[in-house]
Amino acid sequence: MSNVDINHARALVYQLLSSLFAREIDEQRLKQLTSEQAQLFWTQLGYASEFSAPVANIQKVLNGLTSDEALLELAADYCGLFLVGTKHSASPYASLYLSPEEEPLLFGQQHQQMSEFLHQSQLQVQSHFPEPADHLAVILAYMGHLTCHSEDAAQLSFLNACIDSWLAKFVAKVVECDSKHSNGFYSALATLTLAWVQQDKQQLEQAIN
């Protein structure tokens, strides 16, 4: 594969992970995620040993969503984990993990920083996604953009400062809170995201050095 092909594949993974943290899975999205093309994508991603377990869990849950009730239960899991904002949830905002304040404000420093990154790239958070710019979905989507539009050093700098600096804490919180739910979809998604970011970071470091 050429560097262009590799970066395109990396962008696809970041965009996929971003989309799954951005909103609940509805019937239309489920069809996309379980299509023949998507199944091939999941299988290829799962070939890597560090991704195989979470990918298998994700595929198992997606292929088992065969009723409206099951979809609603997964949507409730998403809401309980990411939208409620209690001690039993895992808020997906960087500021809550990076701010030294005991009760950091949304739309704070990390939001402003990400907004500036987006502005510099002539991008913005879409109007139908009314969340602070330091939401994990926005950050992962921006990293996907960088893979095809920035040098390796700039990608690594952003990854270290804006993702790797807090992702492990967030993932640990997701796993802790999601353990109450039977299918563990979001635990698997979070675990996959961390493994992917760690591998991508390692490959960027090797490419630079």
Swiss-Prot record:
GO terms for biological process: protein complex oligomerization; protein folding. SUPFAM superfamilies: TorD-like. The keyword Cell wall biogenesis/degradation does not apply. GO terms for cellular component: cytoplasm. InterPro entries: Chaperone_TorD, DMSO/NO3_reduct_chaperone, HscB_C_sf, TorD-like_sf, TorD/DmsD_chaperones. Signal peptide: none annotated. The keyword DNA-binding does not apply. Pfam families: Nitrate_red_del. Keywords: Chaperone, Cytoplasm. It is found in: Cytoplasm. Its main location: cytoplasm. Gene3D superfamilies: 1.20.120.1820, HscB, C-terminal domain. Involved in the biogenesis of TorA. Acts on TorA before the insertion of the molybdenum cofactor and, as a result, probably favors a conformation of the apoenzyme that is competent for acquiring the cofactor. NCBIfam families: PRK04976.1. Belongs to the TorD/DmsD family. TorD subfamily. This is Chaperone protein TorD. It comes from Shewanella sp. (strain MR-7).
